[in-house]
């Protein structure tokens, strides 16, 4: 069981896919069709991995910002069984490493086409 959260603030619709561990159902895909920003797990093991995440993102063309999450960082122990964000990033186009753990967004500041934004861990 997984919970998907959707938020809308000041005209920007955000979707957080939680600990998604399987492909979206047709019903979920339809419900999530309109979004501006999507947070996607990419680390595998506990969630979908890089390939599944990339395929999922390709099915969400209206998401203008994709933010990968639930991946290995240098702050996790080496024995933690999830992958880094690199395999996902190599599979995607328009990847930006933000260099911060925070971004400020508005409807007018969203990119015109889909971009992947890799944030630093907090």
Question: Where in the sequence are the language-model features?
Answer:
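Core dinuclear metal-dependent hydrolase active-site scaffold
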Residues: 1-33, 37, 45-48, 99-122
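Proline-aspartate-enriched helix->loop->beta-strand connector
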Residues: 34-40, 44, 50-71
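N-terminal start-of-chain detector that recognizes signal peptides
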Residues: 10-12, 39, 89-93
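Binuclear metal-ion centers of metallo-dependent hydrolases, dominated by the metallo-beta-lactamase
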Residues: 65-122
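Conserved strand-to-helix beginnings and helix N-cap segments that scaffold or border functional pockets
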Residues: 26-29, 50-53, 78-82
């Amino acid at each position: 069981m997984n919970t998907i959260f959707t938020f809308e603030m000041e005209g920007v619709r955000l979707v957080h896919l939680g600990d998604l561990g399987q492909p979206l159902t047709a019903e979920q895909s339809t419900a999530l069709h309109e979004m501006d920003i999507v947070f996607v797990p990419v680390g595998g093991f506990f969630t979908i991995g890089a390939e599944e995440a990339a395929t999922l993102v390709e099915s969400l063309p209206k998401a203008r910002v994709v933010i990968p999450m639930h991946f290995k960082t240098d702050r996790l122990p080496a024995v933690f069984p999830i992958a880094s964000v690199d395999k996902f990033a190599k599979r995607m186009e328009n990847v930006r490493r933000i260099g911060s753990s925070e971004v400020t967004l508005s409807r007018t500041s969203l990119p015109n086409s889909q971009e992947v934004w890799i944030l630093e861990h907090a």
